[in-house]
């Protein structure tokens, strides 16, 4: 019986690991790999790789040894990517992308009404006031959504996991916006320094497209996270539910 009780807890941890990969490792890997491509003319990475292949061919490096070298390189790449995503991109993108853009284009009740497809939010505001003692306003909409998140986790952990995906998608989008912007500016400077270069020109176009696409994704994901929390709260508060049972066998 104890084993069956612990099984859902173990399985519930798997999505969060996947969300960490989405929100932190992928943007960090993009920044790391993009930096290598942007500085390809400066860093002797291409020559080092060619020399490695030559040494491996001359010394008849075994398949097992080559696999170890490649696996270790990928592990180091993943560690550095996670470090960049967790300690560099995540806090900076929260400050420079989410908060600054939130000042320029704040989320409002009118926008939530359109997003949820309802013309009247009075019932939602009433239900929110019943649960938390006050009504959400335009100024407090983002902060108030966290109370909806806590309520959803309490009532339905399954929907709470879905919220985790929303958070991961938003973090990935805003981190990619920052990484794309840094890479675009750095590559543009390198392009002016070296002069016309077909590779850097093509890479600039790709970075520009990535920057625009990631920003559009960020704009949608931030709405989905905040407005989606209120939508889930409305759905749960408008239907009977049972408190999650604890300690049952």
Give residue ranges: language-model regions.
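Charge-rich cytosolic interhelical loops and cytosolic tails of multi-pass membrane proteins
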Residues: 93-160
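Solvent-exposed, extramembrane regions of membrane proteins
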Residues: 2-8, 153-157, 240-249
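Loop-to-transmembrane boundary segments
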Residues: 13-26, 135-188
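Charged/polar, solvent-exposed surface patches and flexible loops
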Residues: 98, 126, 164, 168, ...
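Enrichment for repetitive, rod-forming helical segments
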Residues: 31, 172, 181, 229-232
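Alpha-helical oligomerization segments
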Residues: 203-249
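N-terminal first transmembrane alpha-helix
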Residues: 1-119, 190-205, 216-223
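Hydrophobic core of alpha-helical transmembrane segments in multi-pass integral membrane proteins
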Residues: 34, 181-186, 205-213
């Amino acid at each position: 019986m104890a084993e069956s009780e612990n099984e859902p807890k173990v399985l519930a941890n798997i999505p969060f690991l996947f969300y960490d990969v989405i929100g932190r490792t992928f943007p960090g890997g993009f920044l790391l790999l993009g930096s290598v491509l942007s500085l390809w003319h400066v860093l002797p990475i291409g020559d080092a790789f060619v020399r490695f292949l030559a040494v491996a061919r001359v010394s008849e490096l075994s398949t097992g040894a080559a696999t170890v070298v490649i696996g270790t390189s990928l592990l180091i790449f993943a560690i550095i990517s996670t470090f960049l995503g967790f300690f560099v991109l995540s806090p900076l993108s929260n400050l420079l992308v989410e908060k600054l853009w939130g000042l320029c284009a704040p989320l409002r009740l009118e926008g939530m009404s359109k997003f949820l497809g309802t013309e009247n939010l009075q019932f939602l505001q009433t239900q929110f006031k019943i649960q938390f003692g006050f009504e959400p306003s335009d100024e407090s909409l983002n902060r108030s959504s966290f109370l909806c998140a806590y309520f959803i986790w309490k009532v339905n952990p399954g929907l709470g996991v879905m919220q985790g995906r929303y958070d991961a998608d938003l973090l990935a989008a805003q981190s990619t916006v920052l990484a794309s912007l840094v890479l675009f500016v750095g590559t543009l400077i390198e392009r002016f320094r070296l002069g016309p270069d077909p590779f850097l020109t093509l890479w600039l176009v790709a970075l520009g497209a990535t920057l625009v696409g990631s920003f559009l994704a960020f704009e949608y994901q931030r709405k989905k996270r905040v407005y989606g929390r209120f939508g889930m709260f409305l759905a749960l508060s408008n239907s009977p539910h049972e408190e999650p049972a604890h300690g049952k066998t």
